[in-house]
Amino acid sequence: MSMLVDVSYFISGPRQIRNATTAKMPTAEGLSANNVIYGYIRSFQRKFLNDVVGFTLAGQITDYLEIIENESPKTENDTVSPYEYVCRQLRESFADYVFYHILRDMNTDATVTGLIQLKSSNKHVSPLQRQVSTWNTMVERNKQFVCWASSDECPFKVNVNKNLLIPINSFNL
């Protein structure tokens, strides 16, 4: 499956995940972190696209991503696909969406008797607060996408799920 984002969105900055790397020869920890990230991207990409552009366009974008993965590199004279314009608008928002889900899932560990909250000696920021701020950043990016999609610059009609436009708080209200 071709992906809207890759691990490079998670190696530095506010979405940094420890040990994530773009190195050609990653360490075992780097490889493990990258595999987790790619697993989340694969798991959530189609749902995100369905929710942010609608089912039909999500399928077309997925097909486009498959095609460009198998094509030879573009030259300066090649025209940019209308799908690429949409992908460019969505990449940062999708990276936030993936990071939100990683934070949510990595904060607890499932056992037979229930969920256990993980403790860490190097915990500096409450995972819940980080989740809230990541979600709300994604919401702001999605609102910008809606403005762009409503303009003449967007080559497609999109149908955004309103849940992706609603900020959250630490009380889940």
What are these language model-derived features?
Residues 94:
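Catalytic-loop motifs flanking and including active-site residues across diverse enzymes
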Residues 1-91, 105-113, 117, 124-133, ...:
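Conserved short "hinge" loops at termini or chain/domain junctions
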